[in-house]
């Protein structure tokens, strides 16, 4: 029987595969976020006319999902392997299935289903046509064609493939608990992450200072606005991410009512929309540097008319 891939070998295999498809290998973005989609490497780059092919691992924090390290499949923080390709290759689904083969999962020997699940992220004004990918009855990937990001229509269309690494590793290694996953030879997932899982859960549900978080949300929102007034897209977006994580902490603590919840989401969404518009305008001002010369000249000429 062949040796099963460790967690880090799964990452390395996916990195090599998508590198071979001309994706840039980016690194995780250094702000808390609830999903790889919220990284500027996806959120900002999915809008505007410039091409963008990237792949990266993104630790994703969801305070309300914390379970003190006691639930085998529910986590405060999990890891996503994110692939974004713009424009979307016509064979993106075939490429995805090929990536599974590289991980030792033969599509002809397993029940792999694309289950329609259109995607929406209200807090960033984003939506798209989507599918969950189920492997022998377990969801392992979200597949999305973005239609709107930051309130802006996308064009060309960006394809996003988001692998749930813990689920994928649990399947490949045939373990029932995420904490039994072998991260590297001789080192279990739980030996690395069960302590922070417990501590972050305790903090999110019991210890966090609600008043401080409420004040921070207001301050982060204001600072994002100040940065946008100066045309500083990336600092502004950092504060949008801080607003989002702060809201998630408040939500986990039960500090916001149903009515207030909608209001906070709208405030984050409004900021995200301004960030998106400002980013596109700034890329245009720079002359769309990632476009080829012919397309750039044509677009800039059309915009000038």
Curated annotation (Swiss-Prot):
Record's GO cellular component terms: cytosol
The question of whether Cytoplasm is a record keyword is answered with: yes
Q: Which GO terms describe its molecular function?
A: ATP binding; catalytic activity, acting on a protein; glycine-tRNA ligase activity; transferase activity
Q: In its UniProt record, which GO terms are filed under biological process?
A: glycyl-tRNA aminoacylation
Q: What is its EC number?
A: 6.1.1.14
Q: Which domain of life is it from?
A: Bacteria
User: Which CDD domains does this entry report, sorted A to Z?
Assistant: GlyRS_alpha_core
- Which PROSITE patterns does UniProt cross-reference here? AA_TRNA_LIGASE_II_GLYAB
UniProt keywords (A-Z) are: Aminoacyl-tRNA synthetase, ATP-binding, Cytoplasm, Ligase, Nucleotide-binding, Protein biosynthesis
The record's family statement is:
Belongs to the class-II aminoacyl-tRNA synthetase family.
Q: What is the designated name of this protein?
A: Glycine--tRNA ligase alpha subunit
Organism, by scientific name, is Streptococcus pneumoniae serotype 4 (strain ATCC BAA-334 / TIGR4)
Q: What is the lineage of its organism?
A: Bacteria, Bacillati, Bacillota, Bacilli, Lactobacillales
